Amino acid sequence: MKVLHVVTLHTPTNAFGGPTRVALNLARGLRGRGVDAELVTLGDGFPEGRLPEEVEGVPARIFRARHVLPRFEVSGITSPSLLAGARRLVRSADVVHVHLMRDLITLPVAVAALQCGRPLVLQTHGMIDPSDKPLAKVLDALATKRLLRRADAVLHLTEWERGDLEAVVGAGELARPVRLPNGTALHQPRVRSGPPTVLYLARFQTRKRPKVFAEAIPEVLKQYPDARFVLAGPDSGELAGTLETVRALGVENAVRHIGPLSHAEALEAFRAADVYVLPSVDEPFAMSLLESMSVGTPVVVRESNGLAPDIERAGAGRVVRRPEDVGKAVLELLGAEANQAASQAAWRLIRDELSLDAVLDILQGVYETATKDRSPASSARSASGRS
């Protein structure tokens, strides 16, 4: 079976975050099971010349991004050559798996898959929700609603996300919804050593609330004066403000900013940390949390995070209601007994419920159903039933 994983963007600094990480994890996992999975995406931030032909061992067709609508950021990038070859591309696949957002790449490729009669699986990563923005309304009218109604399966992370999708497309009109949590590989649990280390590893973006992380630092330093705080991830507009907050609080000597990390470097950063803090709001299902817990590093999240119920139930970290509670949660998890208990719980949560193998089992079942439903025999039966 050949599967195309279509995602909007890949950059050298992993600037697009979760959707690309999920696409790569799934494609790599599928290839390990004998599936011919490839990545199709735009590339940005690469030097002039030939673009990579594989990413982390996954064969990739990367087209150079053109910023045709800069004010819409990632939603405004496209590739004329990819769009021109979209129909030929989707015809080469047994299944087209699109990591869908309102943009000028994933929407057109998904439409091409429908038009060519290819089995189409959509995964929205919390990126499609009700919106009053004019561009969203136009794209929904032209493509989004039709795709959500006619796809062979629509993968959602949580019931909350499914509700958002139904609000966009209309009650009862969502095509074959299937809950597919994100999953990650399980790694050797970390061994705690050295001074206390607290990590922020995410985009520096308003929704991620990196300043909340910075504002918690003085409270932690009062009890752990040797604690170290690491800031990592690509800038999406909030880095300067976060560093200014650090300076204004007078804690710059305890803070290290290390910038964007590769996937391997990110895993090492999680392994070196005692606590990972992601203070973002309305985060559907952050891959960074899974990766932190996969090495046994406890996490601190806000209650609007899609993983908050699982983290709280398992005891894999702390869930806070207010931003001012982040410091207290970190202090609790820096205690030796609490840290060990949360570390073990985090690792078990990945092993038992959120492993990549469990996710791949579900996904392969979705693919098999989609291809059977599009088989000639199935089409003949459907036509007979309608006559």
Where are these regions (language model features)?
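Short hydrophobic beta-strand element within catalytic cores of glycosyltransferases
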Residues: 298-302
